A protein has these predicted regions:
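Acidic (Asp/Glu-rich) sequence patches and key acidic residues
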Residues: 1-125
Length: 125
């Protein structure tokens, strides 16, 4: 299984409505194991991440007002991509692991962009 990255909006009654994803759009936020081995890892936590480490214990719901801060966190991880790849568990080569993380960060960034555009939130589950 893999983690899914989705964009949601709040309905007038407060319920979350997950937006439809266009067919063919890849929305993986990483493998299920990445909840603890990458996003929730001690290394990612040591960088000051506070959103993605939530995945170690639960699904991540980033409300609209927190999306800009989440965007900064993802930008921090991207800026330290080589270190994140080296500092987290990997079943593949370092280069493959780095490429996988980069791809997942790009997917998360695209969802953040959409959320900012429409005033929505980001869900990773």
């Amino acid at each position: 299984m893999s983690l899914l990255v989705e964009v949601f909006v709040r309905e007038p009654d407060g319920k979350r409505r997950i937006l439809d994803v266009p067919e063919g759009v890849y929305q993986s936020g990483g493998f299920e194991s990445w909840r603890t081995t990458v996003w929730g890892s001690e290394f990612v936590r040591s960088l000051g991440a506070r959103f993605l480490p939530v995945l170690a214990a639960d699904d991540l719901y980033v409300e609209a007002e927190d999306v800009p801060e989440f965007q900064r966190e993802v930008a921090l991880l991207r800026s330290r991509l080589d270190e994140v790849a080296e500092g987290t568990q990997r079943p593949r080569t370092l280069e493959e692991h780095r490429d996988q993380i980069e791809t997942r960060l790009r997917i998360i960034e695209e969802s953040i962009g959409k959320a900012l555009e429409i005033g929505g939130g980001v869900l990773i589950w």
